[in-house]
Amino acid sequence: MTVSASRPRLLVLYHFFHPDRVVSARIFSDFAAEQAARGWDVTALTTNRSLDDEAVRYPAEETWNGVRIHRVFRPAWTQKRPVPRLGNSAWTLAAWFARAVQLGPFDAVVLGSDPSFAASLAIPLRAAWPRTPIIHWCLDVFPDAGEAEWTGATRLLSPPARAVMSAAYRCCDVVVDLGPCMRRRLEAYGGSPARETLTPWALVEPDAPAPADPAVRRELFGDAKLGLLYAGSMSRSHDFESLLALARACRARSGDDVAICFACTGTNLPVLKAAVRPDDTNIRFAAFADEAAIQRRFEAADFHLGSLRPDFTGIVVPSKFFAALAVGRPFIFAGAPDAAIATWTRELDVGFVLEPGGADDVAARLAALAHEPAQMQAARARAFAAYRSRFAKRIINDRWAALLARMRAGRPTPTG
């Protein structure tokens, strides 16, 4: 296959892709479609398995929004345990390399970070296409993300995994991170690739902040004057203890006027529910919503909550921050004060950073806002403006297009 003289060819690789609905799959699918609309001939390599149900298999090939999708076969091994997940990674990366060589050459390659160790594919791709720009868009840092849950014999994988990933990052022309903390982790692996920060965007981007639906707000927060929503995943990487401390500080100061609703799923949800006491009357739970209800819930809240354990700082970045700002809702982040979300929250004045021991201070600010609707409206306006000017899908994809154009201009056209 020869490279098109009229449209440069871009290869995008990610474990899950359209029509999967998980956030990262939709981000990579939208990215591929956006670059196709900007003039690239885009090929996506993914797998034939659904994230939600391994028994569901997608067609081997499909064209969607100008993107040619090629799905390699992957066994129906669970993604919920480390060893089968590593098996899925090894299988998928080997199948991808074989298919990529058949489909290539390309003018540029963008590698995601799923499956685990996906960036290691840069090593054989660099050998096969020494002059093709390889870009790694890192949504999760490996092996750091894996080490957080490896136990027993799997911990022995850490030294060789770090050696492999160090070699992989060195094979990339550009490593795209999600913020300064992630960049510092990636820089520790050595090498001298170019560095860029390009964040994900919100899946829903309304034209203006919408008022809350009274019925949805009552369902989530009862009669509270201020509603704080934690929506999404509650996994090992998330710190719910700080959020419980905030809820209790709010109740001590304002009674039930400030309510927190957890509408989430994940491995830590049962632990969170067990930690809630009978006197936590301003803490509520709601079932995890389907996509049709998510935007109404997001708009029903006054603030959105996010958390990240300090040891996960720089490994992942909570995407709910972007979703909250997109609907014009400020954010409260519980995590390390130097985390990217904390830095942006302070820099853009779009919420509060909940540091250890800081629950009373944030509770006092919330109590004041509960009686200051004009200030709350101003906070919403700042959040919405920050998203539109800094994190919107159009802006991020324009920056991606500029990066791809620069890389193509700096590399000869691949020949095989």
Language-model regions, residue ranges each:
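A charged, aromatic-enriched C-terminal amphipathic alpha-helix characteristic of glycosyltransferases
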Residues: 215, 357, 361, 373-405
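Nucleotide-sugar donor phosphate/pyrophosphate-binding loop at the beta->alpha transition
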Residues: 133-135, 144-167
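Membrane-proximal helix-turn-helix segments that form the acceptor-binding/catalytic region
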Residues: 120, 124-128, 155-175
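Conserved donor-binding/catalytic core segment of Leloir-type glycosyltransferases
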Residues: 220-238, 243-248
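A short, active-site helix/loop in glycosyltransferases that binds the activated sugar's phosphate group
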Residues: 162-195, 204, 400
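Nucleotide-sugar-dependent
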Residues: 238, 290-297, 304-325, 330-343
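Nucleotide-activated donor-binding/catalytic signature segment of Leloir-type glycosyltransferases, i.e.
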Residues: 225, 254-255, 261-264, 269-295
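N-terminal subdomain of nucleotide-sugar transferases
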Residues: 1-67, 174, 245, 250-253, ...
